[in-house]
């Protein structure tokens, strides 16, 4: 086992704080409408330019192992916020840095780290309650567009496109972002269905970079039961091979010999194939398979209908223009089903929704309805260069995630104002334990950090902006960094999804609390390079051997 280097107490916290500061300082320059770009070197090709906090955070790796541990724990804040809310990563990083800095000072002054953490947690719970109370539901398409515009760094065209896509496919519909071959950024609405089952084997993957299986102009075989052998299917498989088209198999399960045979055929290139489990369970699974059959214009191979696998012909298979499968989801685009059949099925599901008395059943029926009727919206991002397209795509994805979050939990005034206004709720909390109270005060101060940073990135003194906002009675009064003016944030359309603000604070306080309570750090000592082998000499004198 390699020797370890161990740091304790103040030394450990100082090194960790240096790492936190390096990562946070690189990320926080991107915050707000006047945030700056960060240029990231790539091992090959042109450097990447981004204003996306989590993209910057993921690229940072420090030489000093202890500093790097601090940086990586802060990176976790950005990643977690991105996974849960899809946006707000820079805000989360700024909040975490503010809490860690003040927390480290308090610990250095002799306060109990565990009591500080209790105070931090108490204050954060009060802020979250306050944000939930202030959140207003998103009522109109215009509000959706405003949320999208703010998250896309003030790009109104992106906000409008996302609102348009959500209007077409519904809030529950599927919206994907792709790169466009042309200069234009456009929205394309495609009929399609997405369900939460991924490929059964990674060997089905066709795009190694994205780890997805993409099949074009594909046949779809739907089977109600498990497939453990392929003998009965050989006639239909041969017909598919002769047609030269790929095949998607959706069944209760594909196991053992059947899966192995499909994988071998896929790797040898004989049959472009992918297999996924059927979505849902029990009767619901059968209903969803029937939905897919209607969408693709195929037939469900079911014992109830007296159908056997050996009797299946290629005409019984469904068809789709494209199928995309990743580790967790399958999306069927442009199924070949008849419009009249799909509409009849939609009508049938709507009737079931009206009749059902169970909330759970109603929710599941509505999910099926969204899948059948919703379709898929594709936002194709264009630009003059590859660098521009990638940067714009980052912003579109952020904006899309933010609008989804806004629809889920509502909106609050943007520009860090919601957190600043929550100071009132935290200020009402008192605790007899001075160390717990110090933890509450740490959060009280940290709530100012996002507004300060947005102002500083716009070249304005942060303290002045914070003071001016807090002087005003209006809850929606704030600083518009774009115009460098004080405005009613909601009226101006500067709004944040409540979910993004909540998640940013929760994740920031969670990781910051761990950093503040850290008392020792352990890292591997660098291995010394082994000495080089000595150069080999000759074989010495061979005399005395009697020759």
UniProtKB/Swiss-Prot annotation:
Catalytic activity entry: ATP + H2O + a folded polypeptide = ADP + phosphate + an unfolded polypeptide
Enzyme class, spelled out: isomerase
Major localization listed first in the record, in broad terms: cytoplasm
CC annotations in GO: cytoplasm
Gene Ontology BP, a term: protein refolding
Superkingdom of source: Bacteria
Reported function: Together with its co-chaperonin GroES, plays an essential role in assisting protein folding. The GroEL-GroES system forms a nano-cage that allows encapsulation of the non-native substrate proteins and provides a physical environment optimized to promote and accelerate protein folding.
Subunit structure: Forms a cylinder of 14 subunits composed of two heptameric rings stacked back-to-back. Interacts with the co-chaperonin GroES.
Name recorded for this polypeptide: Chaperonin GroEL 1
Species this chain originates from: Bradyrhizobium sp. (strain BTAi1 / ATCC BAA-1182)
Phylogenetic lineage: Bacteria, Pseudomonadati, Pseudomonadota, Alphaproteobacteria, Hyphomicrobiales
């Amino acid at each position: 086992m390699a020797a370890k280097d161990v740091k304790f107490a103040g030394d450990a916290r100082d090194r960790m704080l240096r790492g936190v500061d390096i990562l946070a300082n690189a990320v926080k320059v991107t915050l707000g409408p006047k945030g700056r770009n960060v240029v990231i070197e790539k091992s090959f090709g042109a450097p990447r330019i981004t204003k996306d906090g989590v993209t910057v955070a993921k690229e940072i790796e420090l030489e000093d192992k202890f500093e790097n541990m601090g940086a990586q724990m802060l990176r976790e804040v950005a990643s977690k916020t991105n996974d849960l809310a899809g946006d707000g990563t820079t805000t989360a990083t700024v909040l975490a840095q503010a809490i860690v800095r003040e927390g480290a000072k308090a610990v250095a002054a002799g306060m109990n780290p565990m009591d500080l953490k209790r105070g931090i947690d108490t204050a954060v719970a009060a802020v979250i309650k306050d944000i939930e109370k202030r959140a207003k539901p998103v009522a109109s398409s215009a509000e959706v567009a405003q949320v999208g515009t703010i998250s896309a760094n003030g790009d109104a065209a992106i906000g409008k496109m996302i609102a348009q896509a959500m209007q077409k496919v519904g809030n529950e519909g599927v919206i994907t972002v792709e790169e466009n071959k042309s200069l234009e950024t456009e929205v394309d609405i495609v009929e399609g269905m997405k369900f939460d089952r991924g490929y059964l084997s990674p060997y089905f993957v066709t795009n190694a970079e994205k780890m997805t299986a993409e099949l074009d102009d594909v046949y779809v075989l739907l089977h109600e039961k498990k497939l453990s052998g392929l003998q009965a299917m050989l006639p239909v498989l041969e017909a598919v091979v002769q047609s030269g088209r790929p095949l998607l198999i959706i069944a209760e399960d594909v196991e053992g010999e059947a899966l192995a045979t499909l994988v071998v055929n896929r790797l040898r290139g004989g049959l472009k194939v992918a297999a996924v489990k059927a979505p849902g369970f029990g009767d619901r699974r059968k209903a969803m398979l029937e939905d897919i059959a209607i969408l693709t214009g195929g037939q469900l191979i079911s014992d109830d209908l007296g159908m056997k696998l050996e009797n299946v012909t290629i005409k019984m298979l469904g068809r789709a223009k494209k199928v995309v499968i990743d580790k967790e989801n399958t999306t069927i685009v442009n199924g070949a089903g008849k419009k009249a059949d799909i509409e009849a099925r939609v009508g049938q599901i709507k009737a079931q929704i009206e009749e059902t008395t169970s909330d759970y059943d109603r929710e599941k029926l509505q999910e099926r309805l969204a899948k059948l009727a919703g379709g898929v919206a594709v936002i194709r991002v264009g630009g003059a260069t590859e660098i521009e397209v990638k940067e714009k795509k980052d912003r579109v994805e952020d904006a899309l995630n933010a609008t989804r979050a806004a629809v889920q939990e509502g909106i609050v005034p943007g520009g860090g104002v919601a957190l600043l206004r929550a100071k009132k709720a935290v200020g009402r909390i008192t605790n007899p334990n001075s160390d717990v109270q110090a933890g509450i005060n740490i959060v009280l101060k940290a709530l100012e950090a996002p507004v300060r940073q947005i102002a500083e990135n716009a070249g304005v003194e942060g303290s002045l902006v914070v003071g001016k906002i807090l002087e005003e009675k209006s809850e929606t009064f704030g600083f518009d960094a774009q115009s460098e003016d004080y405005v009613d944030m909601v009226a101006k359309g500067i709004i944040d999804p409540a979910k993004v603000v909540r998640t940013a604070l929760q994740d920031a306080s969670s990781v910051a609390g761990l950093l503040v309570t850290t008392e020792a750090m352990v890292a591997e000592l660098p291995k010394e390079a082994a000495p080089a082998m000595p150069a080999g000499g000759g074989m010495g004198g061979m005399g005395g051997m009697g020759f």
